[in-house]
Design a protein with these regions (language model features):
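Register position in tetratricopeptide repeats
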Residues: 2, 37, 67, 101, ...
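Start-of-helix register in tetratricopeptide repeats
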Residues: 25-26, 56, 90, 124-127
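Canonical tetratricopeptide repeat
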Residues: 30, 60, 94, 128-131
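Residue-level recognition of tetratricopeptide repeat
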Residues: 33, 63-66, 97
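Terminal, low-structured helical/coil segments at or just beyond the last alpha-helical repeat
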Residues: 109-149
Length: 149
């Protein structure tokens, strides 16, 4: 994989699926990563779907969907990732960025604010706060209050 010989790496991981099936989640993740790095995003999504690395797989698939401009699919996956408390803040800010990328300014602002309000002590809230100030000129305290400038 390091030499960027993606097809050879994929073939090796596919062989490992039969040789060591107990690690199928790792092998499918590696196959998906090769597809993603080589720009074959639809194939990457299909391989990520075979992996068992949740909730990380939601973020990986959503990233591919965003690169394909399939924003609704990405949003569904980020909302699924929000169900896991350990990744909820990260998923929330990704929802905001996805709306922003798709041209949904109002929803983007709403989700950046939600990230600040729901997860005030996280780095994602700090990032959302800074983004609201710099891009949208909205001042939001990490406690959730806001003031338009």
């Amino acid at each position: 994989r390091e030499a960027k010989e993606w097809d050879k790496a994929i073939a090796t991981y596919q062989t490992l699926l039969t040789v060591e099936p107990g690690k199928f989640g790792d092998w499918y993740w590696a196959i998906a990563d090769c597809y993603e790095r080589s720009g074959r995003l639809k194939e990457a999504i299909r391989s990520y779907q075979q992996s068992d690395k949740y909730p990380s797989v939601y973020f990986a698939m959503a990233s591919c969907h965003r690169r394909l401009k399939q924003y609704k699919e990405a949003l569904v996956l980020y909302h699924q990732a929000r169900a896991d408390q350990s990744t909820a803040a990260q998923a929330s800010i990704h929802i905001a960025y996805t709306y922003e990328q798709s041209g949904g300014r109002e929803n983007a602002i709403k989700w950046f604010q939600q990230t600040c309000k729901l997860y005030p002590k996280t780095s994602h809230a700090s990032q959302a706060h800074a983004h609201l100030q710099t891009k949208y000129k909205i001042s939001v305290t990490l406690g959730g209050a806001n003031e338009n400038k």
